[in-house]
Amino acid sequence: MSEELSAIDRSILELVQRNADISTGEIAEAVGLSQSPCWRRLQRLKDEGYIKRQVALIDRQKLGESFFIFASLKMVTLTPQERADFMRKIEAIPEILECYTLFGEMDVMIKVYSQSMNWFQNFVFNVLMKLPGVQDIQSTVTISELKYTTAIPVR
């Protein structure tokens, strides 16, 4: 990070994370700049890593019935090599959308995209329980989505 984010930079980040298709002209108009300085700011935000990448958000309901399951994993103590192996395997499983390490009774929390309870049961026994160091799994099945956003507050 080469400099502190200005109010204009923050506004640009708010706009592009809500709509990655927004044009530089639309951003410039919204933040009160001409297109060239706006484009330079946008490039700097990308170059400095504030904007990691631009993606399309898929409506999962259009793909058929699905739901998310949050699974907490209790782990045995792993060596650094085993921990690295665990992370490589987690990263290679496309149905695991997010993974976090935790403080508390459980050690890892994952968010899993599931098509059915039967699929998830097989996933637990054939995939999760075979990961290095997994001792126990507690799962929470979602029944509805009240709020979903990928936008983070940039105040």
Indicate residue ranges for each PLM-predicted region.
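A compositional/biophysical signature of low hydrophobicity enriched in polar/charged and small residues
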Residues: 1-155
